Amino acid sequence: PVDTPNIKLTTEPDAELNDSETTESLTHAETGSADTSATAVSTFQAGGLSLEPAKGDWASESLQQQVEVANNATDLQGQHDGLVSVINHCYKMRKQADYCQYGAALQLTYLELYRSLHQQHVAQKNTDDIKAPAFMQLSTLLNDVGQFDEALKVCQQALEYQLTDGTVTGFEGRIKRIEKAKAKA
């Protein structure tokens, strides 16, 4: 079994927030996600990320360090960069099922964190500064673990943010490829 983070975001009702911090409450039931395989807790709130450590023989020291860096980040940009690093590492190691599962399970945490970061950048009128390779990587990880609908949602979300994945066909082409893979499954 893989120790994967549950994508459950919690709210601290007494926390004071400034413009660069946010708290949200999001659960699998609220998002309609059918994936219930992720059981460990991961939170994103004003105090920072709380990703479940990657445990087991499969988890490299590098991944464990990246999870720790992400958890220790105190601002949205640092949390985003740390989480992107974890997702990128899982993406690179996706031929190993444990990495693929762990990375795919970060989907909702990443989408919520990106939404908050995007809102912050919109308020500061500098959305061009956000780099978001994790949308492409998450869609691939989700596709690889057979969560085709979730992979499609990630691509559609990227299109809503007007992001590109660096390929000729973009997220539109990626959506078509995921739909083909879904039809074959």
Where are these regions (language model features)?
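Alpha-helical junction/boundary sensor with strong preference for TPR arrays
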Residues: 70-73, 107-121, 161-166, 182
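Alpha-helical adaptor scaffolds
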Residues: 80-153
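Residue-identity detector for glycine
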Residues: 32, 47-48, 56, 78, ...
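Short, structured coil/loop segments at alpha-helix boundaries
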Residues: 60-62, 75, 95-99, 124, ...
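TPR/TPR-like alpha-solenoid helical repeat scaffolds
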Residues: 121-136, 166-185
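Polar alpha-helical coiled-coil and adjacent low-complexity
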Residues: 69-72, 82, 94-97, 171-178, ...
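Long, contiguous interaction/recruitment modules in multidomain scaffold/adaptor proteins
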Residues: 1-80, 98
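Amphipathic alpha-helical binding modules
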Residues: 141-150, 154-167, 175, 179
